[in-house]
């Protein structure tokens, strides 16, 4: 889904999906605010969540659990990911001009928080 006003983008994203596909049984969003827009659009179009369409967010913010229909989400280690990215930038800045930064492959653990939208 596009970036910007997350709520509106989530809402408009459902409209675009309805135009492009006959049936959609699941929607994954990048942020809970997009998910809130998706849930609103689905409700207004008469779709039942999760019976007809499942919704999952990739951010895992607490707000998703506070909704009327609590949103399922993936809990990502954002602080750890941000710290590692900052460390890599600092290593690159501090490296000698003739040193290339090494390519690094990192895997971060996630946790599925199952709620009412799946």
Model-identified regions with their sequence ranges:
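Active-site donor-binding acidic/aromatic loop of nucleotide-activated sugar
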Residues: 1-2, 55
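Flexible loop/turn connectors
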Residues: 20-118
């Amino acid at each position: 889904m596009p970036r910007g006003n997350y709520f509106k983008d989530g809402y408009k994203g459902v409209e675009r999906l309805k135009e492009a596909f006959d049936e959609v049984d699941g929607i994954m969003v990048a942020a809970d605010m997009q998910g809130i827009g998706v849930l609103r659009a689905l409700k207004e179009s008469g779709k039942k969540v999760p019976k007809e369409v499942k919704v999952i967010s990739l951010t895992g913010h607490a707000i998703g659990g506070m909704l009327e229909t609590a949103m399922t989400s993936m809990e990502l280690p954002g602080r750890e990911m941000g710290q590692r990215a900052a460390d890599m930038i600092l290593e690159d800045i501090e490296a000698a001009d003739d040193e290339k930064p090494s390519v690094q492959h990192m895997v971060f653990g996630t946790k599925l928080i199952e709620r009412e939208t799946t």
